């Protein structure tokens, strides 16, 4: 009995001495749970050719904005009478166009926020050794729903109309490109540059600023799975809201469209975080089943936080300065419109337009079923996942148990022993 008494007394003495060490270990274990590793780059060998297009007779020059989430690809025309655009990118060696078939008709396209109408013509296109006939080209006039719509080039090839990506496959099978890859970046909100078959070397050589996310279905959409949204700049994963949404990327959209179920999330976790927020700061209006948030310009004079969407271990940022646009001024106040709008749907699908894509250079990689984003406007959350949170809890649990065994139990024994 004396042996056990001495043992516990020694434990009390050692426990009191080692208490700061256990606190230090507890702190270190917490820090270890927050470690982040770089996400490895999937190496993709670059192709050989870049692509620029001139279409129609007389020839019209186009910069293409690739939208493979639909069968159409938005383009901006240089000779369009309603287009204020002057760049001429026609390259005779890279692409030529033959006389179109003079088949012109009228059509209407619908999407989640309205419709676009214009004239369709069918053009034959020759790109290197590749030749395709009757490619759809829609020259769309601007309207209240699609202010940036100047033209549309279809990715659908008539011989295989069910596959919207098949032009990429046809180019690959023809030997004109070595990899089934589309790459583009925006020159501004209205235009961009397309390359087919290759990725610029400066992207493939820069592992730090290039990341990818997996395409999560087979419905001919370029989309990724977003798991969380972070509505502040603290970069604390545990403050991120779980959403598990399907992110559909569309260069034909200017804004981001989010299911209406998330409206309260943004109001409560984003707008109400501003120190000067009150009930009059922002209001919600419904236009054609789209819920829009209007805020007083004076309320937004204080710079607010960015918004981060976490996909495949990376947080992609939309900065505060890009989240609002001026809309109107009445007799008393000026208002700004929040560029994330909310629509009625039963699916958890988030549509990302140019407000997101203009932040990055984008690679559509049909070889590996990936989308890649290049730019330094993101943060690595690869190791900072729910599994790490469980490991973090495990570290703390073990530390508490050790603390209890080494200090608390001997102290209890000592107190009860003296009482006897």
PLM regions: where:
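Active-site beta-strand/loop microenvironment that shapes enzyme catalytic pockets
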Residues: 68-72, 238-269
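Classical eukaryotic N-terminal signal peptides for Sec-dependent ER targeting/secretion
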Residues: 1-25, 420
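N-terminal signal peptide
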Residues: 25-37
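Aspartic protease catalytic domain
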Residues: 33, 45, 66, 136-143, ...
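Signature of the N-terminal lobe/flap region of pepsin-like aspartyl proteases
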Residues: 44-141, 146-148, 276-291
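Short conserved beta-strand and strand-loop elements enriched in small hydrophobics
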Residues: 52-55, 121-130, 184, 229-232, ...
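Short hydrophobic beta-strand that contains or immediately precedes a catalytic carboxylate
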Residues: 53-55, 62-66, 73-75, 152, ...
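Aspartyl protease catalytic domain
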Residues: 34-45, 126, 131-242, 327, ...
